[in-house]
Amino acid sequence: MARYIGPVCRQCRREGMKLYLKGERCHSEKCAIEKRNFIPGQHGKDRAKKIVGYGLQLREKQKVRRVYGVLERQFRNAFEKAALQKGITGENLMQNLERRLDSVIYRMGFGTSRAQARQVVRHGHINVNGRKCNIPSALINVGDEITVRETSKNNATILSARDATAHAPAPNWIEVDREGLKGRVQSLPKREDLVQIQLNEQLIVELYSK
């Protein structure tokens, strides 16, 4: 499946909740959910119905995929890796998604959205343990130090994102030095540290276990 390049706010409307895909816009009155909280499309207002069974599992998977901006193939690979790990598969899956470099940069406040954080990583602005890393899907481990490269410390996008997210504290599992544009992963994220939206990862496990 190709990456979605249409209007981002349609994805939130399709899931019926804020997925926080547009940074500061999601916290303003311009948010599409605030203005048109119904399924997009000509007959969107008339299509509301109770979803059960497979449909509920599918919507939960799509919701998480959209939050983290991953393709179906990437998502399935992440699930298969989580299934091989010790512990609860659903929690392993969410933890691995949260440990992606683009997600960590977003959590540190150096991107107002995961999409912007992904762009920051791809453009080569980030070092991991002193070495440049431009792979958004790279998994970050406990003890890893993430820094904005010296040549990028005056980057307008990063500085603007840092200022825009000053009101949002970093999660407990990341120690962030906002002025120094760096941070360190202190522990693995716990279930309560994960995404801002309400979700049931067990439905995803049931979907892929069929």
From Swiss-Prot:
Description of how the protein assembles with itself and partners: Part of the 30S ribosomal subunit. Contacts protein S5. The interaction surface between S4 and S5 is involved in control of translational fidelity.
One GO biological process term: translation
Known role: One of the primary rRNA binding proteins, it binds directly to 16S rRNA where it nucleates assembly of the body of the 30S subunit. With S5 and S12 plays an important role in translational accuracy.
UniProt cross-references to HAMAP family, sorted A to Z: Ribosomal_uS4_B
SMART domains, per the entry: Ribosomal_S4, S4
Keywords tagged on the record: Ribonucleoprotein, Ribosomal protein, RNA-binding, rRNA-binding
Gene responsible for this protein: rpsD
Source organism, top-level taxon: Bacteria
Record Pfam families: Ribosomal_S4, S4
GO terms assigned for molecular function: rRNA binding; structural constituent of ribosome
Domain S4 RNA-binding: 99-161
Family: Belongs to the universal ribosomal protein uS4 family.
Protein name: Small ribosomal subunit protein uS4
GO cellular component: small ribosomal subunit
NCBIfam families the UniProt entry points to: PRK05327.1 (NF003717), rpsD_bact (TIGR01017)
Signal peptide interval: none
Matches recorded under InterPro entries: Ribosomal_uS4, Ribosomal_uS4_bac-type, Ribosomal_uS4_CS, Ribosomal_uS4_N, S4_RNA-bd, S4_RNA-bd_sf
The organism of origin for this protein: Solibacter usitatus (strain Ellin6076)
